[in-house]
Amino acid sequence: MGRGVSSGGGQSSLGYLFGGGEAPKSAEKPAPVQKPAPSSSAEKLKEIPAGIQSSKANNYMRAEGQNCGNFLTDRPSTKVQAAPGGGSSLDYLFSGNKDGK
């Protein structure tokens, strides 16, 4: 058995290297690539999710973290502001006196 001769497993695709085969076809020229048009500011606004103002779109760069302040809802914080037994927001109901007078 010589070079370029198939051994029964099918015809070799490398026949053009060893002779006796056709040269490979040249690749077709790819279609010219068109550059996308620059996007307008209206299209950029569509990329921002609903409910997020463009000035607050990046929540990861905040120094205090993303779970503080007006992260999603722009509502006041429900964080506990005083230690247990400390200043109460219900002092107006109980007249603010701790001795019960």
From Swiss-Prot:
Main function: Acts in maintaining the cortical microtubules organization essential for anisotropic cell growth.
GO biological process: cortical microtubule organization
Chain positions covered by the region annotation Disordered: 1-54, 73-101
Taxonomic source organism: Oryza sativa subsp. japonica (Rice)
Protein name per the record: Protein SPIRAL1-like 3
Extent of Gly residues compositional bias: 1-22
GO CC, one annotated term: cortical microtubule, transverse to long axis
Keywords: Microtubule
